[in-house]
């Protein structure tokens, strides 16, 4: 019994190192505009996880494109649009956000992703919250 358990643990570790774990993950964000009365809580999905990558030792002799590493990024996504409540008539109350449908390990595409690693910004509301949002697909 112990040998079977040990082999299954080793197999799991080997597969875990060989496979990437990049998939849509639930994410809650808060959206507010200074002109509007409320903060909106939105539940969406983002791509999260890790991808297998290797750091090459001979960096001086390789072109820059060979030095890029794979990141967990969107394969398929769609945008949803919500209306922020309590906005005056002169302010556009609509906010669009991406929803991850599927993810992949690949190069970061700056057309639709923020590829710069920055310090985590707070994701808080400073105004009264509204939740249970129904998004409108565009």
Curated annotation (Swiss-Prot):
Query: What family does the entry list?
Result: Belongs to the glycoprotein hormones subunit beta family.
- Residues listed as glycosylation sites in the UniProt record: 43
GO cellular component: a single term: cytoplasm
Gene3D superfamilies per UniProt: Cystine-knot cytokines
Q: Which residues lie in coiled coils?
A: none
Q: Check the UniProt entry and state the signal peptide residues, or none.
A: 1-20
Function in brief: Indispensable for the control of thyroid structure and metabolism.
Name of the coding gene: TSHB
Q: Does the keyword Cell division apply?
A: no
Give the location in the cell: Secreted
Entry's Gene Ontology BP terms = G protein-coupled receptor signaling pathway
Subunit: Heterodimer of a common alpha chain and a unique beta chain which confers biological specificity to thyrotropin, lutropin, follitropin and gonadotropin.
Keyword annotations from UniProtKB, A to Z:
Disulfide bond, Glycoprotein, Hormone, Secreted, Signal
Propeptide residue intervals: 133-138
* Cysteines joined through disulfide linkages: 22-72, 36-87, 39-125, 47-103, 51-105, 108-115
**InterPro entries reported in the protein's UniProt record:** Cystine-knot_cytokine, Glyco_hormone_CN, Gonadotropin_bsu, Gonadotropin_bsu_CS
Q: In which broad location class does this protein mainly occur, judging by the first location in its UniProt entry?
A: secreted
Kindly provide the name given to this protein in its UniProt entry. Answer: Thyrotropin subunit beta
Any one Gene Ontology MF annotation carried by this entry is:
hormone activity
């Amino acid at each position: 019994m112990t040998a079977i358990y040990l082999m299954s643990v080793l197999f799991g570790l080997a597969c875990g190192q060989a496979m990437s774990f990049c998939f849509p993950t639930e994410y809650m964000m808060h959206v507010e505009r200074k002109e509007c009365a409320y903060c909106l809580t939105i539940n969406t999905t983002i791509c999260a996880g890790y991808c297998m990558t290797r750091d090459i030792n001979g960096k001086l002799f390789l072109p820059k494109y060979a030095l890029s590493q794979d990141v967990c990024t969107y394969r398929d996504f769609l945008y949803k649009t919500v209306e922020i409540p309590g906005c005056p008539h002169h302010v556009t109350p609509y906010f669009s956000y991406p929803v991850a449908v599927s993810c992949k390990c690949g190069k970061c595409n700056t057309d639709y992703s923020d590829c710069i690693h920055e310090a985590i910004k707070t994701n808080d509301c400073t105004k009264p919250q509204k939740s249970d949002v129904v998004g409108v697909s565009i």
